[in-house]
Every structure is written in C-alpha cells, then in structure tokens.
C-alpha cells in the first residue's frame, strides 16, 4: 500500500469518528431532555422506555445501524487490498539469511534493563516485614472498615450503597469518596492514589499510571503504552505496533504484515508465497513447486520429477528411469542394459545360447525338457555335450582377446564363430567314437 492509501484510510477513520461523536452528542442531549420529563425510579413503567427500543417518536433509531450499504464498502472488495500479497517476487527474500533479521530481537542491552535487576524494582512489592512487625497500625483499615468516628450507625452504613432509592435522588459527586479506601489516599493497599500494591495511580505492581509490572501507562512488563513486554504501542514482545515478537505491524515473529515467523504476508517459515519451509510456491522444504525435500516438481527427496531419492523420473534410489538400485532400465541387481543378458535371473550371460535353462546355463533344448533327468541316451549325450561345452567356454573366456560386442569388428566376429563351430564338431565326433 502506498502513502496515499494510508492517508486516505486515516482521513476516512477521522471522519467516521467525528460523525459518531456528533451523533453520540445529539443522542445524549435528546436522552437528557427526555429524562427531565420522565420519572427515573425503578418501579416506574416509563423508566426503561426508550432506553434500547426508542419510543414511537423516533422509529428510525436503529435504521441503517448495521445495514448501511456503505459500511462494509471497500473493506475486502478493494482490488488494491490483496495486490502484491502473494505475488511479490521479493516475498521470501531474506527470511532467515538476513544477518539483520534477529538483530536486536532479544539481545538489545536496553531491553531487559531494569526489568528484574533494578534494586528498586521489587522494593515494597510483596513484603513489608519491618512495618508489619513494628508498626501496629500497618493492617489497620486494610481489610476491615472501622465505624468509629462515623456519623452513621453500623446498620445504616450500607444503606443506599448499591440500590437506588425510590425517590430518584441524584447522587453527589462525593458519594463514594472514602467508602473503600484509606482516609489519607484513595489507594486500596498501596501508597499512591489508585495503585493496589504499587506506587502509581493505576499500576497494580508497577510504578506508572496504567502499567501492571512495567513503567509505562499501558505496558504490562514493558515501557510503552500498549506493549506487554516490548517497547511499542501494540507489540507484545517486539518493537512495532502489532507485532508479537517482531518489528512489523501484523507479523507475529517476523517483519511483514501477515507472516507468522517470516517477513512476508502469508509465509510461515519460508520465503515464498505458500511454502512452509522452502523457497517455492508449494514446496515444503525444497525449492520447487511440489517437491517435499528436493528441488524438482514431484520428487520427494531427489531432484527429478518422480524419483524419491534419486535423480530420474521413476527410480526409487538409483539414477535411471525404472531401476531400483542400479542405473539400468529393468536390471534387478546389476547395472547392465540387459540387452547383453536379456532375461537372466542371476547371471550376466547371453541366455540366447542356453535358451531358458532353469538352473544352469546349458542348452536344454537338446535334453528334451526332462524335469529331473534327461531321457535315455539323449540325456547322456546332452550331459557330455554340456560338460565339453563348459570346458570350451572356459577356453574361450581365457582367450587373451575375448569376444566383445563393441571392440571387435564384424570380420573378427565371423572368424571366431567359425573357429568355435569347428571345435564343437570335433568334440562331438570324439564323443561319438567313444560311445
């Protein structure tokens, strides 16, 4: 809000106050003139007439009191009222990182000065042992009234104190003088005019006119008019008008209008419009819109859209799309792309060579799918072939230049396939001769 807006609001409030005062004055005049014509006794039926239900002479008394269309106009419908409340880019800037944020909050050397360390602060507050022990007149008249030297008798003392008389007589200004206070001063227990235990006019324990424990007119513990613990008019602990602990008008702990702990309108702990602890609109601890702890839109702890701890879209702990712990799409424990090991359960070998063996890596297509055995001669032949093939595979793996898919060229791969085929045929012939 600009300065012009504040000036306009102040002028409007001033006009309303002046108008209400004028109306109140007119009402008092009318009421006083009406009271002169009526009897004000309790038993008179005309006593309450016109008090709250204005007589038939003025049926318009309550008209427009709360139904005035201009009364609520502009209260919340002003297009400038909400402007900049949540869309200010500087909204969360400097919430807790500002070195000046907490400066002077509770470390002001003058803040606690004289609160409880003043040697005169507690003097005469709750103990007055010397006077109680030595002065026999200390408690005289404190809790009981002595009727000595009173013109009225004891039975007549309370007559007319709290009940109106039937004659409607007007009370004198001095009627209550000295009724419940000491003869010397109007104070009840204290040493000043209106203090109860303190030394000032209206203070209960403090030293000022309206303070309870503090030194100012309206402060309870503080030094300002309306502050409870702080030094400003309306602040409770802080230094501003409406802040509770902070320095701004409406902030509770912060410096801005509506923030509870921060400096902006609606943020609680963070620096953005709707974030709780983070810096973005919807993030709780992170910096993005929907992330809880991370920096991306939907991630909980990570930096990507759907990852919980990782950096990719769907990974839980890893960095790839579908991997759980690794970096590949569908691998369970490893990190390979599984294009090399299409569907292997425990190993990394190319199971296109073994064609779905359950426990081993052998070519069970030759063993005719026996569950526990390998039927007849086919089973023995398959076992021998598997044993020989295992040896051949070991020899191939011990080759100083093993087969690789990415280093060797196409010609080298063809050459190795031919050599491997020849070795297998020779081993089959030798096995047939022995059988």
From Swiss-Prot:
Residues 23-193, 199-201, 207-209, 215-217, 223-225, 231-233, 239-241, 247-249, 255-257, 263-265, 271-273, 279-281, 287-289, 295-297, 303-305, 311-313, 319-321, 327-329, 335-342, 348-355, 361-368, 374-435 form a propeptide. Residues 230-374, 386-435 are annotated as: Disordered. The keyword Signal applies. Keywords: Amidation, Cleavage on pair of basic residues, Neuropeptide, Pyrrolidone carboxylic acid, Repeat, Secreted, Signal. InterPro entries: Antho-RFamide, FMRFamid-related_peptide-like. Residues 1-22 form the signal peptide. The modification Pyrrolidone carboxylic acid is found at residue 194. Its main location: secreted. GO terms for cellular component: extracellular region. Not known but it could act as a transmitter at neuromuscular synapses. This is Antho-RFamide neuropeptides type 1. It comes from Anthopleura elegantissima.
């Amino acid at each position: 809000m600009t300065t012009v807006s504040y000036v306009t609001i102040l002028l409007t409030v001033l006009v309303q106050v002046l108008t209400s005062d004028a109306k109140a004055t007119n009402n008092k005049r009318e009421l006083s003139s009406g009271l002169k014509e009526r009897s004000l006794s309790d038993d008179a039926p005309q006593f309450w007439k016109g008090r709250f239900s204005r007589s038939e002479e003025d049926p318009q008394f309550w008209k427009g009191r709360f139904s005035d269309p201009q009364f609520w106009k502009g209260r919340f419908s002003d297009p400038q009222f909400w402007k900049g409340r949540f869309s200010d880019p500087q909204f969360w800037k400097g919430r807790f990182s500002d070195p000046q944020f907490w400066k002077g909050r509770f470390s002001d050397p003058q803040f606690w000065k004289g609160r409880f360390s003043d040697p005169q602060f507690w003097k005469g507050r709750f103990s007055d042992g010397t006077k109680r022990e030595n002065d026999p007149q200390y408690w005289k008249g404190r809790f009981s009234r002595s009727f000595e030297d009173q013109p009225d008798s004891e039975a007549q003392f309370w007559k007319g104190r709290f009940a109106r008389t039937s004659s409607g007589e007007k009370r004198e200004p001095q009627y209550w003088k000295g009724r419940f206070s000491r003869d010397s001063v109007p104070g009840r227990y204290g040493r000043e005019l209106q203090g109860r235990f303190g030394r000032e006019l209206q203070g209960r324990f403090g030293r000022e006119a309206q303070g309870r424990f503090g030194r100012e007119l309206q402060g309870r513990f503080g030094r300002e008019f309306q502050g409870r613990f702080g030094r400003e008019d309306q602040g409770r602990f802080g230094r501003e008008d409406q802040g509770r602990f902070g320095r701004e008008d409406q902030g509770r702990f912060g410096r801005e209008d509506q923030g509870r702990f921060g400096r902006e309108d609606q943020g609680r702990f963070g620096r953005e419009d709707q974030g709780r602890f983070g810096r973005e609109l919807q993030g709780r601890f992170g910096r993005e819109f929907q992330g809880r702890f991370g920096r991306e839109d939907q991630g909980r702890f990570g930096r990507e859209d759907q990852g919980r701890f990782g950096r990719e879209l769907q990974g839980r702990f890893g960095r790839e799309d579908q991997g759980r712990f690794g970096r590949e799409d569908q691998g369970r424990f490893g990190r390979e792309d599984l294009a090399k090991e299409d569907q292997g359960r425990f190993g990394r070998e190319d199971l296109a060579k073994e064609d779905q063996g359950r426990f081993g890596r052998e070519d069970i297509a030759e063993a005719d799918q026996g569950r526990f055995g390998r039927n007849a001669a086919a089973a023995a032949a398959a076992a021998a072939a598997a044993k020989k093939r295992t040896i051949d595979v070991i020899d191939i793996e011990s080759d100083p230049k093993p087969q690789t898919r990415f280093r060797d060229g196409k010609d080298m791969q063809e050459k190795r396939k031919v050599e491997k085929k020849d070795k297998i045929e020779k081993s089959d012939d030798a096995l047939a001769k022995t059988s």
